[in-house]
Amino acid sequence: MSMFLDQVTIDVKAGKGGDGMVAFRREKYVPDGGPAGGDGGRGGDVVLVVEEGLRTLMDFRFNRHFKATPGENGMSKGMHGRGSEDLLVKVPPGTTVRDAETGALIGDLIENGQTLVVAKGGRGGRGNIRFASPRNPAPEIAENGEPGQERKIELELKVLADVGLVGFPSVGKSTLLSVISSARPKIGAYHFTTLVPNLGMVTTSDGRSFAAADLPGLIEGASQGVGLGTQFLRHIERTRVILHVIDMSGMEGRDPYEDYLAINKELASHNLRLMERPQIIVANKMDMPEAEENLAKFKEQLAKERTDEYADELPIFPISGVTRKGIEPLLNATADLLEVTPEFPLYEDEVVEEETVRYGFQPEGPEFTIDREPDASWVLSGEKLEKLFEMTNFDHDETVMRFARQLRGMGVDEALRARGAKDGDIVRIGNFEFEFVE
């Protein structure tokens, strides 16, 4: 049996930008050639791409680390490094993407060919050509490439189907799907024969078509994780119409009406919005003895429990998946209902990460933090400060002096002095150590 994987956490790391170069023009008859170090190339992004042929996240079972290539370093004679190609990671349609640490929604990928950048590549470092000025016409200053974005993301697959077949185990959902489509799900006379969602394309007698999904059987407590639990309840979220399949034969000693209430309770417990979707009750196994009697009793109980006398009655279609009796009217009614039912947005209250740039003042957190270690050294940290540190090329004295000026401009010296730092104290940024000088 092919394995079905519908939730996975992966690590993505974009490519680092290429380093800028310190170089000078050295040619015969050009005594004052000046700086000639080129810029580094842009690092590659990590991009998710929807691939229509994929149906599961199985490809991520053994490969969960994705790293884009860095940009090319700058070269002499003013030549810039080449930007790296993006790393394309294929995902099936219906994949939602979240930040694993914050839980924030990054994107919802549903259309073939749709792309989503999940990690941005770093920009290339500037070569010494960029730092030339009248005051310093021959600078020995160049930047390292900017680090690429690194993050953990969660991929969650929710199958794309117009119609979802729900019900208790062994009520005949898989048999029904095999009859109305070309899908060939595993069918057996025991509970939980279906362990993965099965998709099938259904065509009605008048030529209309829709996608239907046979979802694994639910049991009481599924919304709290009992049985197959929430693992497959999520797949119902994308459906527009629910076919609620009920075993009317009562052969296992079950009450059809109690089954109906129990399944609806699980749907509501998982997500209240599932109850907004229109339902069609499929009274299955009508070829069995006592099925007619059970159906009449079911209709009686359903009418008795109606709270709104003006609400439309739920459509009930008696069928037999084995003899195929009543199948055609059911499919036509389902297609009719789909034509008037809109799509239900999955994430109305959540804001998807935007790729557009908004200009304007945005208050930021502190640019750096200072901590005191037990060995009396000082540790500097902070996203902006660490980024400056990583983009500094310490092989050239001028670049080191520039970094010192940047720290002073950020107020690091003043803050250290205010915390009690004295001449000769050790200051650390990452693995780098230097002495504090007043």
UniProtKB/Swiss-Prot annotation:
CDD domains: Obg. GTP binds at residues 167-174, 192-196, 214-217, 284-287, 320-322. One of its GO terms (cellular component) is cytoplasm. SUPFAM superfamilies: Obg GTP-binding protein C-terminal domain, Obg GTP-binding protein N-terminal domain, P-loop containing nucleoside triphosphate hydrolases. Keywords: Cytoplasm, GTP-binding, Hydrolase, Magnesium, Metal-binding, Nucleotide-binding. One of its GO terms (molecular function) is GTPase activity. Residues 161-339 form the OBG-type G domain. It is found in: Cytoplasm. Mg(2+) binds at S174, T194. Residues 360-438 form the OCT domain. Its cofactor is Mg(2+). Residues 128-147 are annotated as: Disordered. An essential GTPase which binds GTP, GDP and possibly (p)ppGpp with moderate affinity, with high nucleotide exchange rates and a fairly low GTP hydrolysis rate. Plays a role in control of the cell cycle, stress response, ribosome biogenesis and in those bacteria that undergo differentiation, in morphogenesis control. Belongs to the TRAFAC class OBG-HflX-like GTPase superfamily. OBG GTPase family. This is GTPase Obg. It comes from Enterococcus faecalis (strain ATCC 700802 / V583).
